[in-house]
């Protein structure tokens, strides 16, 4: 957040058009008209009590069902709405999942560059962030460095694609190699290594 505040200061000093904010993923372009229209439609035509009220802890049942239907259609899985847990933003999702799976002394890998708050989320569990440098020119995962970073304490890997802040999208080949390597390491160490997608 310090970088975000520094960016705001520089915008005031030299103009917003001269500062490129890669800190916390705030948009730099207006929302598409279709998004604005959908919001206006909700405000004008949806039950205002329901719109501004709380949902169940897991999130709105209809939204969770829509998400599970989409995932099932795309990937051939058999998820139900009960497999889906909705949150307001990645920070709460990451905090929940990391607190659920990480134990003190374990390690979680992230690929550089990464969202700086990953370190805070991981370290609050008593675990350690292990930063693995990405390939210099492409920002894809450097598989040799990745393999060297995995050990018996590795419990999770956070991937972010499109990446914040680089914007890189991991290729299918990169993801497949990563998964193959993790399956190999799970067998070697005898425990699961979770992939967390942000």
Model segments located where?
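Proline-centered loop/turn at the N-terminus of a beta-strand
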Residues: 18, 107, 128, 155, ...
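Active-site phosphate-binding strand-loop segment of PLP-dependent enzymes
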Residues: 135-198
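Short beta->alpha connector loops at strand-helix junctions that form conserved
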Residues: 112, 131-136
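A short helix-loop-beta submotif of the ANL/AMP-binding
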Residues: 123-130
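N-terminal small-domain helix-loop-helix segment of the aminotransferase-like
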Residues: 1-89, 96
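Short acidic capping loops at alpha-helix termini that bridge into adjacent secondary structure
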Residues: 78-84, 105-107, 153, 191-192
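Conserved PLP-anchoring active-site segment centered on the Schiff-base-forming lysine
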Residues: 100-121
């Amino acid at each position: 957040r310090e970088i975000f505040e520094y960016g705001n200061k520089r915008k005031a000093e030299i103009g917003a058009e001269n500062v490129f904010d890669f800190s916390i993923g705030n948009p730099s372009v207006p929302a598409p008209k279709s998004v604005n229209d959908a919001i206006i439609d909700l405000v004008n035509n949806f039950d205002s009590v329901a719109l501004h009220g709380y949902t169940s802890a897991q999130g709105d049942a209809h939204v969770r069902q829509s998400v599970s239907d989409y995932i099932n259609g795309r990937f051939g899985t058999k998820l139900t709405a009960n497999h889906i847990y909705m949150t307001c933003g990645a920070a709460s999702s990451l905090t929940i999942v990391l607190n659920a799976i990480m134990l003190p002394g374990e390690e979680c890998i992230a690929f550089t560059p990464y969202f700086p708050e990953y370190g805070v989320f991981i370290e609050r569990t008593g675990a350690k962030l292990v930063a693995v440098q990405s390939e210099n020119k492409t920002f894809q995962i450097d598989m040799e460095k990745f393999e060297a970073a995995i050990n018996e304490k590795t419990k999770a890997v956070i991937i972010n694609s499109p990446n914040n802040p680089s914007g890189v999208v991991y290729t299918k080949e990169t993801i497949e190699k990563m998964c193959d390597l993790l399956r190999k390491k799970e067998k070697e160490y005898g425990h699961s290594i979770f992939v967390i997608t942000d």
